[in-house]
Amino acid sequence: MTKTATAIRFATIPDKNIMKRFLTYFLVSVTGLALLGMLGLGGIYIWATKDLPGFTRITDYRPPLVTTVYARDNSILGYFYREKRFLARLDEMPQHLPLAFLAAEDDSFYRHEGIDFRAILRAFMKNMQAGTIRQGGSTITQQVIKRLLLTSERSYERKIKEAILAYRLERYLSKDEILTIYLNQIYLGAGAYGVEAAARSYFGKHVGELSIAESALLAGLPQAPSKYNPLNNPQDAYTRQLYVLHRMLQLGWITPSQYDAAINEKLVFTSMADPSWGTGAWYLEEVRRRLIDYLSEDNMEKLGIKLERYGEDAVYESGLHVYTAMDPKHQKYAEQSLRDGLVASTKRRGWRGPVEHLESKEAREAFLRDNPVDAAAMQHEGWIKVLVTRVTAAGADVRFGSYKGRMDVETMHWCRTPDPTVVTDYVPAVKDARTVVKAGDVVWAQFMLPDAGKSFDAASVTPDTDFSLAIAQYPEVQGALVSIEPQTGDVVALVGGYSFADSQYNRAVQAKRQPGSAFKPIVYSTALDNGYTPASTVLDAPFVYTDDATAKTWRPENFSGEFYGPTLLRTALVKSRNLCTIRIAQDIGIPAIVERAKALGLEGPFPFDLSVSLGSVAVSPLNLTEAYTAFAHEGLRAQHRMITGIKSAWDEPIATFEPQQTEALTPQNAYIMASLMKEVVRDGTGF
């Protein structure tokens, strides 16, 4: 009995030494595992941090920004950019805008230190359930790191690096600075980077004008800009907006009344007008070309100017403010004048025929289907292609898109068969529309407003509306126009052709043509400094010149083909007499004329023969117009100026271009020439 009891007691009460050894082993194991874990974490930290990028791109935040080009009156001429981003400070935004983004993306932003462990754990559990990385749990600080320093690759390695960098970044920058970077860097769809560009693209306003409802919609975009784009997926965008507003209400960042007002606000989507490549398109393009050349690294080094970007990168990414001499009113009238002149020129040459002829019913239906009509074209007397459906002597019925109209024969009076041997005015006007067009023809036509000065209501237009149109013809001949302010050299208007959309070749700058009689004032100006006066007599008689080297004979004539005998120098210039001009050039010498041309800024090269007096040198319209500034400004030639100043995105001056003038003529010479050239307009070939 005693032995059994003793045995049971030993079995139920363990040896104290065994318990002690167990506790020792347990503590050693736990400590070892903890040390191994710490060593593992330390190894991971060392591995993850060995090739981490620096913070320079963030602490010295210089994102790609839109360069803005201004006209003379500070209106916007256009933009240059690769990413449509306008820098906006936090104090320029309404308070509810950043709060909306925080509600949607990171409501604990101002409480955590760059990493939100609860969000990470939540994302980890969802990813484990999904078997793949579906959710990131990134804070706004981590998103800034990802967008500016790391790739968008979804891996745990990248997430570890992202977390480490986010923790470090919050020691370098304040919360407000990080949030400002995020709100300017984020892509929000529709080609808009940052909240200012998004406000312009979606609502046609600046960021400071956004309502709570509008801010909530923008805040819902970062998660999936395409999916939640309100222009393409309005229902998804609305659902996401409601989520953001509900989160703002839950967090106490808006009141119930503000919430109710926001969810009931009807959003109006409209894009802020972009004037780029509209009026002044050739001017804008020439400014772009000159900026790239001026801001090249070599040129900046010569001028001692240090920039972060050079050449095209500076133009498209630096957010420059570029000020130009272009006067919008002058530019508008210059473009219209050139277009009207080219259209008038093509009409004088007669009717070339339809753009195309469509014989089959299927082809005609396809044309109407594939060529919708812009209401703005109707409103502004624009041009469209129309399909002729029926023709009578009195006119033609036409279709365009889903609309119909009529071209009366009175609009076709100029549509004569081209005949270069007959003066246009002597050709009978067209009186039968059937001689011009037939059913199936596709022609250009211009809208004619019913009553001059009466506003056009596009909303009242229906498929049953009958439009009046005039037949038109697209010009084949091109032209250019340059207008320079002679006192400053400011190029107030520059047009390089009929349509920038059809051809970006800038004939005002890039094309060199013989100026012809426009060169004659240079000859006569030289003559005034070589013994001639306006009252001097010059013989207008046949002239024959034989080149000794080639034995070729040159027999120039006046435009009229007639000879006028002794002629006053004044009359010779006013009437643009070729033979008088050649005799003057022969008398004063070609070298003197070339020297005067160079003094006026013409670039040449110049042929050293008598033909130069009739304008055989090739010059650009811009170059020739600059030369003429000396006649209009007391002999001072003003160097042409298109760009007046350049500033950085932070309004720091980079370059200022002051007017540059050079004395090319004496004031007396310039006065006499200006007087004679006025007579050209009043009573000569310019009349």
Model features per residue range: what roles?
Residues A551-P556, G589-E626, Q639-M642:
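Mid-domain, small-residue-enriched loop/turn segments at the edges of structured enzyme/sensor domains
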